[in-house]
């Protein structure tokens, strides 16, 4: 559906060239929600703007729906862009016209008939649950409602791809969740492919199927959201994953506890259950675990939990207990054994 091949972007400034996007390749499958996450300056905005050629890449190919956009004429590109919708952090609504006109006007400019425009405006305003506000002006809407209008406007061209450029970053947490639920609904009911960028792990875990992590203009890690959460490799990825959990254990406390046992992280997903398995391990082996911190968060279609425990007992018994937990499908990290590297949390 979307393929970037060795795409780079260099900006020329008074101080010289700035490589905002290094040679990058990635694929987005038809019908999936693909997220790109990174801190400010990572290059994610440049990347997503290259997808529809709002930014023309310095090198590489952008292939959408089997078309290489970098080879198209201006007229051909304009036509191809009609199948690529985009929503932004700032909504970009016309303040002097109604909600209805904000959606209808771009359709008129595209040469859509009046009957078809009326049909589409009603259809997509109903999908975003704003049909009753069709005669309202943007100034009368909340931030979340404005973003819903922007989504309806993007969908009214009936694109096959929807690009989301930090669409929820200006919204409060509750409104963000409602917009994410709407995007997930659109993806599942309409089948539209969504490529989004964000700096918030909550966005990735709630609706994405796969994710790419960016830093300094390059993709440093990518995979399914499940794999990224359960087995992050790059230091930046680990920071994002840890940000989804509230666990912060002071380093001096960790060092003190490590003199009387091991600090271990237990991660479990889906049907695996950390606490019951831990209770069974306590009965089977001579170990004495104390839960220091725990949290369960929701990925797109399943729960993911993490427990940080202090486990006391003889080393052999601890090893046997940790091996048992792994056999139950629980990911074990930390400690002084071969179950994983010692991990500091904080």
UniProtKB/Swiss-Prot annotation:
Residue numbers binding ATP: 38-45
GO cellular-component term (any): plasma membrane
EC number: 7.4.2.11
Catalysed transformations (reactions): L-methionine(out) + ATP + H2O = L-methionine(in) + ADP + phosphate + H(+); D-methionine(out) + ATP + H2O = D-methionine(in) + ADP + phosphate + H(+)
Matching InterPro entries: AAA+_ATPase, ABC_transporter-like_ATP-bd, ABC_transporter-like_CS, ACT-like_dom_sf, MetN_ABC, MetN_ABC_transporter-like, NIL_domain, P-loop_NTPase
Localization per record: Cell membrane
Membrane topology, as annotated: Peripheral membrane protein
Alphabetical keyword list: Amino-acid transport, ATP-binding, Cell membrane, Membrane, Nucleotide-binding, Translocase, Transport
Spans through the membrane: none
Record family assignment: Belongs to the ABC transporter superfamily. Methionine importer (TC 3.A.1.24) family.
Oligomer and partners: The complex is composed of two ATP-binding proteins (MetN), two transmembrane proteins (MetI) and a solute-binding protein (MetQ).
Protein name (Swiss-Prot/TrEMBL): Methionine import ATP-binding protein MetN 1
Organism of this sequence: Bacillus cereus (strain ATCC 10987 / NRS 248)
């Amino acid at each position: 559906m979307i393929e970037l091949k060795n795409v780079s972007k260099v900006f020329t400034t008074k101080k010289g060239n700035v490589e905002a996007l290094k040679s990058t390749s990635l694929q987005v499958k038809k019908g999936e929600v693909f997220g790109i996450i990174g801190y400010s300056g990572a290059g994610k905005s440049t990347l997503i703007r290259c997808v529809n050629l709002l930014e023309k890449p310095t090198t590489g190919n952008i292939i959408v729906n089997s078309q290489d956009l970098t080879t198209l004429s201006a007229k051909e590109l304009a036509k191809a862009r009609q199948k690529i919708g985009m929503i932004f952090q700032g909504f970009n609504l016309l303040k002097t016209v109604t909600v209805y006109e904000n959606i209808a006007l771009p359709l008129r400019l595209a040469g859509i008939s009046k009957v078809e425009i009326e049909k589409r405006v009603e259809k997509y305003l109903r999908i975003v649950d704003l049909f009753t506000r069709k005669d309202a002006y943007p100034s009368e809407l909340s931030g979340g409602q404005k973003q819903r209008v922007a989504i309806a406007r993007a969908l009214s061209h009936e694109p096959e791809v929807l690009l989301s450029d930090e669409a929820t970053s200006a919204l409060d947490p509750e409104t963000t969740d409602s917009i994410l639920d709407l995007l997930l609904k659109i993806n599942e009911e309409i089948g539209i492919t969504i490529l989004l960028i964000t700096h918030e792990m909550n966005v990735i875990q709630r609706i994405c199927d796969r994710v790419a992590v960016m830093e300094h203009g390059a993709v440093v890690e990518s995979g399914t959201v499940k794999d990224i959460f359960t087995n992050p490799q790059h230091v930046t990825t680990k920071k994002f994953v840890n940000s989804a959990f509230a666990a912060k254990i002071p380093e001096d406390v960790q060092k003190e506890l490590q003199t009387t046992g091991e600090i271990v992280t237990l991660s479990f997903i889906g049907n695996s259950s950390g606490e019951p398995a831990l209770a069974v391990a306590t009965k089977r082996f001579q170990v004495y675990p104390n839960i220091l911190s725990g949290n369960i968060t929701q990925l797109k279609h399943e729960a993911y939990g993490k427990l940080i425990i202090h486990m006391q007992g003889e080393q052999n018994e601890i090893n046997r207990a940790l091996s048992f937990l792994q056999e139950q499908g629980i990911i074990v990290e930390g400690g002084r054994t071969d179950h994983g590297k010692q991990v500091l949390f904080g």
